[in-house]
Swiss-Prot record:
Keywords: ATP-binding, Cell membrane, Coiled coil, Host-virus interaction, Hypersensitive response, Leucine-rich repeat, Membrane, Nucleotide-binding, Plant defense, Repeat. It is a peripheral membrane protein. InterPro entries: AAA+_ATPase, Apaf_helical, Disease_R_plants, LRR_dom_sf, LRR_R13L4/SHOC2-like, NB-ARC, P-loop_NTPase, RX-like_CC. This is ToMV resistance protein Tm-2(GCR236). It comes from Solanum lycopersicum. ATP binds at residues 185-192. Residues 162-388 form the NB-ARC domain. PANTHER family: DISEASE RESISTANCE PROTEIN RP (PTHR23155), TOMV SUSCEPTIBLE PROTEIN TM-2 (PTHR23155:SF1238). GO terms for molecular function: ADP binding; ATP binding; ATP hydrolysis activity. Transgenic tobacco (cv. SR1) plants expressing Tm-2 exhibit resistance to tobacco mosaic virus (TMV) and tomato mosaic virus (ToMV), tobamoviruses that can multiply in tobacco (cv. SR1). The Tm-2, Tm-2(2) and Tm-2nv alleles present in the tomato mosaic virus (ToMV/TMV)-resistant tomato cv. Craigella isolates GCR236 (AC Q71BH0), cv. Craigella GCR267 (AC Q71BG9) and cv. Yukang 2 (AC Q5MLE9), respectively confers resistance to ToMV but not the tm-2 allele present in the ToMV-susceptible tomato cv. Craigella isolate GCR26 (AC Q71BH1).
Amino acid sequence: MAEILLTSVINKSVEIAGNLLIQEGKRLYWLKEDIDWLQREMRHIRSYVDNAKAKEAGGDSRVKNLLKDIQELAGDVEDLLDDFLPKIQQSNKFNYCLKRSSFADEFAMEIEKIKRRVVDIDRIRKTYNIIDTDNNNDDCVLLDRRRLFLHADETEIIGLDDDFNMLQAKLLNQDLHYGVVSIVGMPGLGKTTLAKKLYRLIRDQFECSGLVYVSQQPRASEILLDIAKQIGLTEQKMKENLEDNLRSLLKIKRYVFLLDDIWDVEIWDDLKLVLPECDSKVGSRIIITSRNSNVGRYIGGESSLHALQPLESEKSFELFTKKIFNFDDNNSWANASPDLVNIGRNIVGRCGGIPLAIVVTAGMLRARERTEHAWNRVLESMGHKVQDGCAKVLALSYNDLPIASRPCFLYFGLYPEDHEIRAFDLINMWIAEKFIVVNSGNRREAEDLAEDVLNDLVSRNLIQLAKRTYNGRISSCRIHDLLHSLCVDLAKESNFFHTAHDAFGDPGNVARLRRITFYSDNVMIEFFRSNPKLEKLRVLFCFAKDPSIFSHMAYFDFKLLHTLVVVMSQSFQAYVTIPSKFGNMTCLRYLRLEGNICGKLPNSIVKLTRLETIDIDRRSLIQPPSGVWESKHLRHLCYRDYGQACNSCFSISSFYPNIYSLHPNNLQTLMWIPDKFFEPRLLHRLINLRKLGILGVSNSTVKMLSIFSPVLKALEVLKLSFSSDPSEQIKLSSYPHIAKLHLNVNRTMALNSQSFPPNLIKLTLANFTVDRYILAVLKTFPKLRKLKMFICKYNEEKMDLSGEANGYSFPQLEVLHIHSPNGLSEVTCTDDVSMPKLKKLLLTGFHCRISLSERLKKLSK
């Protein structure tokens, strides 16, 4: 934790020094010198923290107090800087003379106290012979590792082939008396990976299917609702009598369900009242995974058990080899010395045959030189046996991370287990916390540097890739439950963050909380009712169902809060009153509201001059305040619904931006802003805008976007929703960087070859009129990988997706989805050369004849 706090202090001191230099110039040279001194000293202390931690781990108990002193010092300095920066900005706003202001004198006095503490710490570390390692690995530029995992197989089952074949045969055996298969074993053996691969292979042979993560604190009602949604139970039946309606449907269906990670039998006692027995008469199946054999035995009986075992040595080394070299090659070790191979085998041996430990260790070694010396150091750090399963291996991989990446990894522990986390959220929260900063001379954006960190974590196999974007970048990710536990344990030990269950206790400890996450309504409300002192709180995560969370927040100022995330999971829409005290969160940089809620952000939000991200989920009807544009640090304003609901969020004329009050250099995302509140000529000022979504697009906006020289040179994603048919022809061919385009119109709108950017990767057309000429244009796009056409009218009776005379027919297309086309009598594609790289074909809502080649028929199943 000490090194994390020190890094945060260094980054914040860089920011403050920059602000002083820009805003106050030479008048405050003495104050800037103090800030620069802080930065230098914190870097110096950080350089020997790792050495001190190694001595502590080696049994030198005297160092423990030194590390505690360093952590307290770093925390106090961070508090001082967080308190100081808003005062600089406020003073500059009202043209006060900062040099004569009282808070500047107070700051100077606090710096003197810190100097005395730094002298004491440096004296003690010399006494204990703690070496300055000058380790600046956090400042190194992480390589973009995207190429290492873009095409990786996400369902590796190396060493589990026999298990897979045996279970597949069992699940498809029509004579199976009781259709439950229980995959059990210790954490990290690959139970979930194996179960998912089985489930995905056989689910098409059943009438309905569902995959549910159960977890340590399950709720039967939520699990049943999840199953009901996946099998297509109507919304009315889910609301009226979920249990009875679900059971009635499943009685007449042949189903397969995967219930992942069941911890105890109580939850099964609740579920089995609704799930009909899986007997041989109907042929339904249930796959469960559990780390407890007794759970599997209770649910499916002795015959259901399939216990996974650690991998044998050769299979372990095969998995290690695949992960080290990133491809299957029997000659991978041909150029390696016999000693290096032997060290590699010894490293694998210390992993105890546990796939997760092997994969994580390989990820760590990939980031190092492939030399005997480098690998030997890892081997020596692993001890002589596997301790606590693979816990030591995982902790070693954490310590091997660059210092700047460690808090980014720990952030995954703030989310519930098995939560799918958007890369956009992680990246912008890391930036808000100043874990990621752009050094002078670096022309890349902070978001790009943060993405490098995320790529590195995935490359090291610490994080699991869940989804990719249209262009192959990370869209969302997950963390294995063992690594999630590691995050929580490390965070608690170092006071980086606390979960709700360990937040209660000594008031002094509660007052020092910097980050806290709640997964439970009851615990959260009880905690807030205890009236805790939370003056140092930086991050608050609330995963809840009770909308009263907002009223409880009204009793706290949270003056140092950087990040606020509220995720509401209730099924009904709830009106919430967001307290005006939100305006007191002067340090707030990141605000995310998600869930079925409606309300209004208070006007006091405009006082939050450091706000960088406002992210409102598609189910939330949260009205933005007037003046939100004026935050000069605003980078992302996201409203994720493009329907009428989103339009109603902007029903205040005062939202209309003053074009001269904008600070456009930072703005990167404007998503689903109604055109009526959007002045087209401000587009010229948004020079760094990467993503833009506009509702009710007007002729003037179309005209501005369609000029010969692109008005938004950095634009990568464009989403336009038209409420009427524009008279202007949209022309986007001059935008070379737009890779994702979404066009939605309610009436006829003409398109031609000039309508599209030349380098499209993903295109979505909704409610458009399409003819064979436009289709012929789309077939020629050299980079188009995903094409979706929803409720589009086709001007002719037959849509032919076959190759053109020139041979072109979607050369790079991987996904094609056509839904509810109007006016068609036939869709055909019978040749074998069209769409050669297609992986997924979805033809839904069709009421016409479909003629496909045998290859395409298989892809459409």
